[in-house]
Structures are given as C-alpha cells and as structure tokens.
Amino acid sequence: MFSVLSYGRLVARAVLGGLSQTDPRAGGGGGGDYGLVTAGCGFGKDFRKGLLKKGACYGDDACFVARHRSADVLGVADGVGGWRDYGVDPSQFSGTLMRTCERLVKEGRFVPSNPIGILTTSYCELLQNKVPLLGSSTACIVVLDRTSHRLHTANLGDSGFLVVRGGEVVHRSDEQQHYFNTPFQLSIAPPEAEGVVLSDSPDAADSTSFDVQLGDIILTATDGLFDNMPDYMILQELKKLKNSNYESIQQTARSIAEQAHELAYDPNYMSPFAQFACDNGLNVRGGKPDDITVLLSIVAEYTD
C-alpha cells in the first residue's frame, strides 16, 4: 500500500507540545548543532497492491534525504505526466534529478545557504548527459544548516513545504504557476521542441532563509498532498505527533499520506484543487488523483 523512506536517528530532547513549543529556552539560540529526524511515505497514482517501484519514487514523484557534516538536505520532485503521451517515462527525469541532488550533497558539492545552487548544478548535469534525458519536473529543496540553525529553501513549481511551530504554520513555500494547473518546471526537450516546451530556470525558484527551533515540524511534499489536504487537515494530523522519535514521525507521515490518498478518490469532496479550479471558472468537484510524496521532519539536537 505504501513505501516508507527513513533517515537518521538523532538525539531529540525537545518533546512536542512541551519544552520546544512553550519554553523560550527552546529557541533557535542554542549552542549545539541541529539536525533533522525525517520519515517519508508516498503513493503512486496508479498504485496497485503489491506493485511498488524500488527506491524513493512514488509514481512520477521522487525524493531524497541526505546528510552531510554541515547540513541535512532533503527534496521532492514531481515529474510532469504529460510526457507519457510522447513515449517518455516522466519518473526518469524527476528520479534522476533527485538522485543527482543527493549525490552532490553527499560529496559536499554544495553550500548550505544556496539550495538553488544544488538545483542548478543537478539540472546542468542532466543537460550534459551523453544520452538525452527528456522530461520535466517541479522541485523543492530544503537545507538545515547545522551550526547556524537556519533553514534554506528553494521551491520551483507547486511542490512545497510547511514549517509548523506550536500547532501553527509559521513558514510556507509560495506556489509558482504560469496559469491554472501549469506549474513552473525544469525541462529538457528534444531539439525540435526547444522553445515550445515550457521550461524555467532553476534561478526562477522561490528561495527563503529563516531560523528554526528545536521541535519545529517541517513537512515537504509534492502537490498530490497539497491539492487534496488543506492546511487545517494537515495540522490536525500533526497534532497526533506527541514526541520526536523516529517511529512516531514515521507513523504520522504514513497517516497524512494515506488520508490524502483516500481524499484524492472521493468524488464528493471539495478538495483544494477543486476549489482552485472553481476559482478559475471550471466546474470541478472531488479530489485530485495524483502521486503523493510526504517527507516529515523534526528539528532535533544533532549527534554524529
């Protein structure tokens, strides 16, 4: 039914709903290094029981979680399904993009304060492949700098992230759309289609930087989540996260992905996507069947 991606077991002394949420001593000014405890879950849109792709891919979505001595880095990407009409597997582009980002981080070929640089270098490597890799993808990269306790993000398109503190959203990504249901995207097209296929530069990604605190919750996901679950539903699920151990985070990530997957196939549900469609003059109701990828992280004290 689902596949779970995990990374890291950190010493997490901040307990959700306790010190990290209410006590000023839990603020971002502590002297120790920070890290992320991350778990993930996802569904492919065309999921059938027992059929799962290997690796961190759910349908045309892809993701990665990587650790370096200077930072924890994670990302999600949503391959554009329209390429399938031209005989191209959309998951190849998104999957290769995320694997390249992961490798760059593990090799230390990045600057924590510049997540756009990770996207740019990865995209350039794809462009320089001897064997052409056609396709398009959105992308969202999140970097936690261990020593500065700052989160640096880059978001291109309609994947994105939320940062939750004290039960409220304190930071979130901005969705980037050219027009309805047409997000910003990185693309590689055949020569004859260059200038015709929609393609954005990594530099077009929305970039933010801000301090985080111990116990902050970071949810990074593709649009399959956000198109089917409004913030209030996500926050309701996050309230069930009572502590910051890995098993609890994994269970909550799974619960969020499962609920989004169920809502995606409810024809009577007025989903955020359906509401957005109505706002654009379309008579639409129901969830939006789509690939869903959820990475759920908690900021914790880091131990190597």
From Swiss-Prot:
One of its GO terms (cellular component) is mitochondrion. It is an enzyme of class 3 (hydrolase). Its cofactor is Mg(2+); Mn(2+). It holds the Pfam family SpoIIE. Expressed in keratinocytes (at protein level). Its main location: mitochondrion. It is found in: Mitochondrion matrix. Keywords: Hydrolase, Magnesium, Manganese, Metal-binding, Mitochondrion, Protein phosphatase, Transit peptide. Coiled coil: none annotated. Induction: By hydrogen peroxide and nutrional stress (such as low glucose). Up-regulated during lymphocyte activation. Its EC number is 3.1.3.16. Mn(2+) 2 binds at residues 78, 223. One of its GO terms (biological process) is negative regulation of mitophagy. It comes from the Eukaryota. Gene3D superfamilies: PPM-type phosphatase domain. Binds 2 magnesium or manganese ions per subunit. It catalyses: O-phospho-L-seryl-[protein] + H2O = L-seryl-[protein] + phosphate; O-phospho-L-threonyl-[protein] + H2O = L-threonyl-[protein] + phosphate. Inhibited by sodium orthovanadate. GO terms for molecular function: metal ion binding; protein serine/threonine phosphatase activity; protein-macromolecule adaptor activity. Residues 69-299 form the PPM-type phosphatase domain. Belongs to the PP2C family. Interacts with FBXL4, BNIP3 and NIX; these interactions are important for ubiquitination and degradation of BNIP3 and NIX. Protein phosphatase that plays an essential role in mitochondrial metabolism and biogenesis. Positively regulates biosynthesis of the ubiquinone, coenzyme Q. Dephosphorylates the ubiquinone biosynthesis protein COQ7 which is likely to lead to its activation. Serves as a crucial sensor for mitophagy, though the underlying mechanism remains ambiguous. May dephosphorylate BNIP3 and NIX and thereby directly regulates mitophagy receptor function and stability. This is Protein phosphatase PTC7 homolog. The gene is PPTC7.
